[in-house]
Amino acid sequence: MENKPHILVVDDNAMILRNIKCILDPYYSVAVAPSGLHAFLAIGKKKPDLILLDYEMPEMNGKEVLEKLKSDEEMKDIPVAFLTSIDTKEVVVELLALKPAGYLLKPVESQALLNKVFEIIGK
């Protein structure tokens, strides 16, 4: 059994979590988390090679999750790509200011998702 790169998908929308998991599952080991708080529990169990992170979530949004990741020595090097359905100039500027590994607009097409993941983790 080959050792597949591990991806954590964080989104408060269960349908999006299922869809992204179905797209990535043939190629990667995939875990899902319905919130930022659940993401940190999942990271504690298995450190991912990439986090696909919803930008707009209740309780702890994507920006807050990324800031917490970057402030932690053990998690700061995990690449994060944002998922968002908002494509206004202001949001894009705010996203890019956080220096993510990338971002994708939702709904994301299968090939665009696979291309972005491959671009970031190279596997």
PLM regions and their residue ranges:
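Two-component/phosphorelay signaling modules centered on CheY-like receiver
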Residues: 14-31
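C-terminal output helix
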Residues: 15, 108-117
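Helix N-cap/capping motif at the beta->alpha junctions
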Residues: 32-41, 62
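Short amphipathic alpha-helix used as the core "switch/output" element in two-component signaling
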Residues: 41, 63-76
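Active-site beta3 strand of CheY-like receiver
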Residues: 46-52
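Receiver (REC) domain active-site loop signature in two-component systems and cognate sites
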Residues: 57
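Alpha4 helix (beta4-alpha4-beta5 surface) of REC/receiver domains from two-component response regulators
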Residues: 64, 87-104, 115
